[in-house]
């Protein structure tokens, strides 16, 4: 296990030394999204946000309409609270109200709920329910702006209880060591996951790298290497992700996901997105939380976002998108993916309740 983990760390450490040490935690996407990884710096006293998204979707397998995923869909009704208790203590909480069910724990709908203590400007510790440090630019995207996921992200849960130890190499480079419940953990399977992540912000070049060791059964491990890159060029942004997965014999291409994305913002109102994803697993089968053995799928598509009132306190966006998937499905693939068309039109909004209340108060008491 030790030698395999070192082999994962090598590309990460080479990336640190090659890029140089003079940057910060990775910024959001060109669309102004917040980080799913929850590893973002927050300087405000208190923020309370409420947001949701509603879509009208149509999915086809070849020319046959799929009834279950089609129609009106309410997505991601969420409330998030974050703030500073003291100069050293901060907290963050986000609840997906739409995921709270009568037959499940309230925490199943909790994305993250953590308390962080900063020892100094370099070191901090975070504990609670946290985002698993998988890395990649796609993984950083806010759930409300995830229209078409890569096949891998349809399977593992991304939020678990754990502890993060953070170290700021400079104001612009951050390392995170995480010990948390494994994404494979169930009530009958007490397993854990260990991760080293690097977040870099180097002018136009941003990195989100991670090396992971996760138990899929007690004492049995799968290894991940995630390399996420964001490149900013004026009004354009390019996101390139690579994730490698292996259990016994390491191979960079037999079990991997490669994703490329181009985002262009011609003005403050429009965001144009085109993407392509390749996913394969030719090595093993780990059941329902994984890409099935024998899969080799390619997905491409595009999204158009329109923001009629691009304000900081209230975000309103109208979106439309399309994607197509083709290739070879795995031997135990439960949901057919190849020759599948996906179309969506919808609206999303997010409101900063505290900022909006202050704005209304100030207008009434001028």
Predicted regions and their residues:
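N-terminal periplasmic/intermembrane-space "pro-region" immediately following the signal or transit peptide
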Residues: 1-53, 342, 346-351, 356-366
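Outer-membrane beta-barrel pore domains
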Residues: 53-67, 103, 118, 202-366
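Short catalytic/ligand-binding loop motif for oxyanion handling, primarily in non-cytosolic enzymes
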Residues: 134-136, 185-187, 328-329
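Aromatic-acidic/polar surface patches that form glycan- and anion
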Residues: 70-72, 108, 187, 293, ...
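Exposed loop/turn and edge beta-strand positions of beta-sandwich/beta-sheet ligand-binding modules
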Residues: 75, 109, 121, 159, ...
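Outer membrane beta-barrel
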Residues: 37-58, 68-182, 199-201
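Loop-centered beta-sheet repeat module
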Residues: 176-221
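Contiguous hydrophobic segments
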Residues: 145, 149-164, 171-174, 185, ...
């Amino acid at each position: 296990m030790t030698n395999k983990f070192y082999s994962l760390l090598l590309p990460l450490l080479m990336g640190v030394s090659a890029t140089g040490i003079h940057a910060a935690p990775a910024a959001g996407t060109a669309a102004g999204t917040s980080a799913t990884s929850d590893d973002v710096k927050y300087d405000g006293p208190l923020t309370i946000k409420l947001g949701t998204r509603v879509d009208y979707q149509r999915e086809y397998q070849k020319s046959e309409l799929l009834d279950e995923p089609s129609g009106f869909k309410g997505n991601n009704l969420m409330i998030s609270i974050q703030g500073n208790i003291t100069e050293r203590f901060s907290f963050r909480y986000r609840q997906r109200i739409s995921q709270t069910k009568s037959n499940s724990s309230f925490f199943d709908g909790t994305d993250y709920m953590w308390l962080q203590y900063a020892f100094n400007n370099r070191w901090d510790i975070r504990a609670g329910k946290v985002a698993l440090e998988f890395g990649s630019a796609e993984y950083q995207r806010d759930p409300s702006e995830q229209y078409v996921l890569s096949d891998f992200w349809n399977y593992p849960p991304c939020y678990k209880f754990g502890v993060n130890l953070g170290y700021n190499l400079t104001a612009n480079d951050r390392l995170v060591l995480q010990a948390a419940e494994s994404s494979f953990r169930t009530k009958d399977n007490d397993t854990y996951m260990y991760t080293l992540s690097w977040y870099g912000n180097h002018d136009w070049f941003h990195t989100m790298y991670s090396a992971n060791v996760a138990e899929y059964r007690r004492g049995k491990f799968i290894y991940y290497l995630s390399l996420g890159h964001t490149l900013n060029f004026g009004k354009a942004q390019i996101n390139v992700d690579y994730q490698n997965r292996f259990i016994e014999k390491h191979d960079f291409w037999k079990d991997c996901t490669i994703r490329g994305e181009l985002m262009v913002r011609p003005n403050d109102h429009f965001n144009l997105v085109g993407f392509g994803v390749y996913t394969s697993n030719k090595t093993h089968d780990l059941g329902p939380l994984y890409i099935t053995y024998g899969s080799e799928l390619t997905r491409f598509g595009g999204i158009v976002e329109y923001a009629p009132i691009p304000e900081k306190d209230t975000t309103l966006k109208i979106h439309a998108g399309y994607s197509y998937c083709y290739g070879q499905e795995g031997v135990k693939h439960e949901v057919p993916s190849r020759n599948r068309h996906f179309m969506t039109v919808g609206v999303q909004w997010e409101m900063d309740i505290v900022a909006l209340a202050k704005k209304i108060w100030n207008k009434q008491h001028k």
